[in-house]
């Protein structure tokens, strides 16, 4: 998703901009710039760490997991680079979108890009959660049956989402300029006199499909992560009863459970408001486009804008919850442990070269 930190007073909402509004607009442009730079740095760091770890790994399963994380970071990074500059350009121009894009092709490209990179990120995260749950809950079945390489699966997900996002180009669904006029996305309903009644059923179906697919991906991710946490706790208790390294297993389980809960919190906070609000607007036969022509829609329009802002944060937070924070916190923990000599070498958690895959080495035993 793009960095949609739009100002509350846009050129489209107010055609007669005063100097004060211009000043506000120039200040507001700092938001999308900050979002783009922050997302670029985080995802670039994640890709660098994944690349270094990938070259050191010999296990195909671990390489597949690293490839999924790298693909997710690349997806978020490319999505930002394709959309954020357009938003910044609209901010700085202080002109209506229709003046910058009279043909509507840029709007279609923008909406398609947001759909592809937003939905593909959700589906890739869901696929990673499924693989993680199978590897932990049924390791022997997973090792003997899961022979598919990660690359074809990731390409299949991306191409499927691309085919879905191209439906509005074929006449099923519609991408339109969204309030306050600085971005384009899926139309959820009628837009006053501008809407073609013949295309409205297709728009509703397409928007509903996007929201339902996104919510389904969230549900699958939540269910698989909870199943993984439950399996980790059960295995930790079993290991503690027969092994002397119960402290090590406790640390591994706690750290992994915290990371998985962090992933669930980030996904729910970032995506649930937008997807649920889209379904609500479809049910109420409302579209954000109506904010340009109808009074009394300020509350709904502001709520939808906040929901899109939250969704845009997912691109920035993804590399941190999946990789960067785990590596940083683990190193900090090891530094504290080494400083206090808390654990002996026989039960200490391995620190050199630790990464998001550290726990998988232990769980295979």
From Swiss-Prot:
Keywords: Cell membrane, Disulfide bond, G-protein coupled receptor, Glycoprotein, Lipoprotein, Membrane, Palmitate, Phosphoprotein, Receptor, Transducer, Transmembrane, Transmembrane helix. Its main location: membrane. This is Prostaglandin E2 receptor EP3 subtype. GO terms for cellular component: plasma membrane. It is found in: Cell membrane. Residues 56-68, 131-151, 230-259, 326-365 are cytoplasmic. It comes from Mus musculus. Ligand binding is affected by cAMP-dependent phosphorylation in brain membranes. It is a multi-pass membrane protein. It comes from the Eukaryota. Residues 1-22 are annotated as: Disordered.
């Amino acid at each position: 998703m793009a960095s949609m930190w739009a100002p509350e007073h846009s050129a489209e909402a107010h055609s007669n901009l005063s100097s004060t509004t211009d000043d506000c607009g120039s200040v507001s442009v700092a938001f999308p710039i900050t979002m783009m730079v922050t997302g670029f740095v985080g995802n670039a760091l994640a890709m660098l760490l994944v690349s270094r770890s990938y070259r050191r790994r010999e296990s195909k399963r671990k390489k597949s997991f690293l490839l999924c994380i790298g693909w997710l970071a690349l997806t978020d990074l490319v999505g930002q680079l394709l959309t954020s500059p357009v938003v910044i350009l609209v901010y700085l121009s202080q002109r209506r979108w229709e003046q910058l894009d009279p043909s509507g092709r840029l709007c279609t490209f923008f909406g398609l890009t947001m759909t592809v990179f937003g939905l593909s990120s959700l589906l890739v995260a869901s696929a990673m959660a499924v693989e993680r749950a199978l590897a932990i809950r049924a390791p022997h079945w997973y090792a003997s049956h899961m022979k598919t390489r990660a690359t074809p699966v990731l390409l299949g997900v991306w191409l499927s989402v691309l085919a879905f996002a191209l439906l509005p180009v074929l006449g099923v669904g519609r991408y339109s300029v969204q309030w306050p006029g600085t971005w384009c996305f899926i139309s959820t309903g009628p837009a006053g006199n501008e809407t073609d009644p013949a295309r409205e059923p297709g728009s509703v179906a397409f928007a509903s499909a996007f929201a339902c697919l996104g919510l389904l991906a969230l549900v699958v991710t939540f269910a698989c992560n909870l199943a993984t946490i439950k399996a980790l706790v059960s295995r930790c208790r079993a290991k503690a009863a027969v092994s002397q390294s119960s402290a090590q297993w406790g640390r591994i389980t706690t750290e992994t459970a915290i990371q998985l809960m962090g992933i669930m919190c980030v996904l729910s906070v970032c995506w649930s408001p937008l997807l649920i609000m889209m379904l609500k607007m479809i049910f109420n036969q409302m579209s954000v486009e109506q904010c340009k022509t109808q009074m009394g829609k300020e509350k709904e329009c502001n709520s939808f804008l906040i929901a899109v802002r939250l969704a845009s944060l997912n691109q920035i937070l993804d590399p941190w919850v999946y990789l960067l924070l785990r590596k940083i916190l683990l190193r900090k923990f090891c530094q504290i442990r080494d400083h206090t000599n808390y654990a002996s070498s026989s039960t200490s958690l391995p620190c050199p070269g630790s990464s998001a895959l550290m726990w998988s080495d232990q769980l295979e035993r």
